[in-house]
């Protein structure tokens, strides 16, 4: 019984690690496809582009006037 539980826990842990790696790789690929990124203070739209470059996030205080803001200033 202990062996079965240990095997089950090991399998679950292995699955979580593999999924985390797959998610990070997919995220990197998606970021690589974002060639039309804009920087600080420029207009952006997370749902359709242009997207904010790495280190920025799209802040929409009043639609449709969304602007890229620095991640460090959150």
Swiss-Prot record:
What keywords would UniProt list here?
A: Amidation, Disulfide bond, Ion channel impairing toxin, Knottin, Neurotoxin, Presynaptic neurotoxin, Secreted, Signal, Toxin, Voltage-gated sodium channel impairing toxin
User: Does the keyword Membrane feature in the UniProt annotation?
Assistant: no
Sequence positions bearing Serine amide: 72
Question: What are the residue ranges of the propeptide?
Answer: 21-34
Q: Name one GO cellular component term.
A: extracellular region
One Pfam family assigned to this protein is: Toxin_7
Q: Which InterPro entries match?
A: Beta/delta-agatoxin_fam
Q: Which cysteines are joined by disulfide bonds?
A: 37-53, 44-58, 52-68, 60-66
Q: What is the tissue specificity? A: Expressed by the venom gland.
Signal peptide positions (record): 1-20
According to the record, the segments passing through the membrane are none
Q: What is known of its domains?
A: The presence of a 'disulfide through disulfide knot' structurally defines this protein as a knottin.
According to its UniProt entry, the function of this protein is described as: Insecticidal neurotoxin that induces an irreversible spastic paralysis when injected into insects. Modifies presynaptic voltage-gated sodium channels (Nav), causing them to open at the normal resting potential of the nerve. This leads to spontaneous release of neurotransmitter and repetitive action potentials in motor neurons.
In the record, the note on similarity to other proteins reads: Belongs to the neurotoxin 07 (Beta/delta-agtx) family. 02 (aga-3) subfamily.
What name appears for this protein in its UniProt entry?
U3-agatoxin-Ao1d
| Species whose genome carries this gene | Agelena orientalis
